[in-house]
């Protein structure tokens, strides 16, 4: 028997003809898909993808009506899986949430047990959603670079889109771990905040989006790119030999205009960060680190 009330409030996006109607309304429990864990949602973060899910031209939503929200955190109120007891604090993000399955902008949610992450001690639901999908992706990027051998002594690391959620969190994590981090941003008024997060230097948008040679001077020991096609060509042609960039964004465009030379002459690596489908075991391990050494 469900512990979710027969009706509850949720933000709903409903496609009608060529437009999307959205607003907070009563939603019926029977409209939620099946799942082993029922959660009283306490917090959800707002992501770029959530905005796209509420637009007629967003190309994100796969069902209509849809409760957006690609992440959520809250309290277990019922569970068919012994790993999750009533009253436990948990989170879920990625997979199909807020895309082809109702998401976190709701008072209640029902999800598969295989998507649920127990919150580590010391990390509240609010803390978890302050980090959110963006912070998780940032941590995933830093870990991917370090798993390839990146260390603070190797030299400067570039973060593009540093004013955004992924970029800003990556900047803070890297700086806290002792790296010399340079922040690229299109918002000059953000320099003070980026310096406070730990940026050793600032690059303007023009410096990282202009055309260049197939290979430019080697500069970066590693990079986190949260923008996409607008900045990634610059990053690739300025990475040092053997360096890597962890890429997760497409707000600056999806079509990548580059050459093979960074790959075949300098051996650089382009690491794709897929936080949506990351296996649950690794996902849980990374959230444990976000409560400890990556916090």
Where are these regions (language model features)?
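Glycine-rich beta-strand-centered segment in the early N-terminal region that forms part
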Residues: 30-46, 56-97
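Residue-level marker of beta-strand positions
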Residues: 71, 88-89, 108, 156, ...
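N-terminal Rossmann-like NAD(P) cofactor-binding module of classical short-chain dehydrogenase/reductase
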Residues: 91, 221-224, 246
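NAD(P)H dinucleotide-binding glycine-rich loop of Rossmann-like/cofactor-binding domains
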Residues: 93-158
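Short, glycine/polar-rich helix-capping loops at beta-to-alpha or helix-loop-helix junctions
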Residues: 105, 186-193, 254-260
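Glycine-rich NAD(P) Rossmann-fold beta1-alpha1 loop
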Residues: 135-136, 161-168, 228
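Adenosine-nucleotide cofactor-binding segment
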Residues: 175-231, 288
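Glycine-rich phosphate-binding loop and adjacent beta-alpha segment
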Residues: 230-295
């Amino acid at each position: 028997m469900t512990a979710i009330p027969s009706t509850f409030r949720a933000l709903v996006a409903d496609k009608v003809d060529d437009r999307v109607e959205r607003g907070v309304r009563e939603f019926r429990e029977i409209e939620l898909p099946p799942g082993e864990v029922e959660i009283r949602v306490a917090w959800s973060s707002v992501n770029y993808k959530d905005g796209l899910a509420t637009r007629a031209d967003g190309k994100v939503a796969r069902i209509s009506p849809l409760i957006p929200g690609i992440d959520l955190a809250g309290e277990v109120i019922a569970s068919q899986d012994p790993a999750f007891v009533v009253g436990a604090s948990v989170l879920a993000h990625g997979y199909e949430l807020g895309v082809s399955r109702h998401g976190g902008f709701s008072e209640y949610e029902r999800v598969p047990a295989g998507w649920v992450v127990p919150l580590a001690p010391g990390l509240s639901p609010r803390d978890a959603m302050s980090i959110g999908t963006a912070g998780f992706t940032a941590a995933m990027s830093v870990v991917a670079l370090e798993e390839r051998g990146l260390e603070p002594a190797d030299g400067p690391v570039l973060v593009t889109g540093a004013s955004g959620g992924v970029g800003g969190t990556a900047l803070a994590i890297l700086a806290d771990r002792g790296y010399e981090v340079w922040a690229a941003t299109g918002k000059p008024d953000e320099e003070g905040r980026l310096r406070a997060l730990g940026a050793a230097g600032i690059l303007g948008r023009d410096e990282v989006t202009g055309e260049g040679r197939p290979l430019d001077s080697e500069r970066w020991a590693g990079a986190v790119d949260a923008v996409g096609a607008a900045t990634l060509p610059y990053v690739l042609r300025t990475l040092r030999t053997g360096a890597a960039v962890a890429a997760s964004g497409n707000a600056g465009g999806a079509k990548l205009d580059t050459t093979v030379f960074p790959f075949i002459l300098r051996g650089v690596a382009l690491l794709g960060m897929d936080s949506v489908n990351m296996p649950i075991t690794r996902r849980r391990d990374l959230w444990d680190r976000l409560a400890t050494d990556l916090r």
